[in-house]
Amino acid sequence: MKALYFNGKSLEYLEDYEKPVRGEDEALIKILYAGICNTDREIMKGYRPDFKGVLGHEFVGEVIESNDKALLGRIVVGEINRGCGHCKYCLRGEENHCINRKVLGINGHDGVFTQFITWRNDLLHVVEDNLDPKKALFTEPLAAAIEICEREDIKPTSRVLLIGDGRLSFMIGQVIALTGADLTVLGKHQNKLDNFKSFANVIMDTDETFEIVIDATGSPSGIETALKLVENRGTIIVKSTYTENIEIDLSEIVVRELSIKGSRCGPFKPALNLLKKGYVEFPDVEFFELKDYEKAFSSKSFKVGFKLWED
């Protein structure tokens, strides 16, 4: 089968990659669409130096084989973290933080830039008929945006600064706006900031400070900006992963009594509900064939992905 294999240094397009065989608790999934995430780019820069295999974790697919008859033939999306089921995190329902977890296309398991994958049945979510499968490709990153509201109690009275004007920020911004909070977006590109104007205040510079600051820049400089613009006793939520190491003055954190929270993967059901009900809107995905991966990774479109099969 076709696949994009990361050899530890670069991507290789293969047409003879071995098709996986499912386990008893797994489904064999025909990948219809796969989305490119910034994490994929970071892995290619060295974020996960131990990973070699098929990249990609955002997908929409069709269940071809499964012992769960309710899944057979259904269009699905899938959570990306697969826990061991035995550690303290798994036993208290925090599989995303399992110390032995496998992560699609990131750690210990081939990803979705290929034509077929196997994945555990209970990690799959059915895409209802009234949701376009191409729109469902936003489920995983949208769930990650929703997780911010799980990590921090954002109220209608909260004053929130979102740093970054890229794809992830656009998703986060729409989610935060639904809380009724006073949202301001700080970015560097006026043409991108224009997309936020319907639900947020937009700025390119400020000395004002905010109760909650979210860094979704994907750049180490975002943390520096967040520290300057968060109120004393405020909260910084970090939404990006970085290849580089970042230095932070811990004395400043202590003296100003700041809270810094990481936020990663999130709940799929609310994400599917928001997409299905049209509460969030995103531009269409630009799709490429796997063999054109270089064009895909260099595209400037809002969302880029792979279409794995011809119509």
Regions found by a protein language model. Give the residues of each.
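Glycine-rich beta-strand-centered segment in the early N-terminal region that forms part
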Residues: 18-34, 47-88, 128-131
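Mid-domain Rossmann-like dinucleotide-binding core that forms the NAD(H)/NADP(H) cofactor-binding site
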Residues: 73, 131-207
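N-terminal Rossmann-like NAD(P) cofactor-binding module of classical short-chain dehydrogenase/reductase
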Residues: 77, 214, 237
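NAD(P)H dinucleotide-binding glycine-rich loop of Rossmann-like/cofactor-binding domains
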Residues: 84-163
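Short SAM/SAH-binding signature in class I
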Residues: 210-216, 303
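Glycine-rich phosphate-binding loop and adjacent beta-alpha segment
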Residues: 220-274, 308-311
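C-terminal hydrophobic helical "lid"/dimerization subdomain
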Residues: 269-311
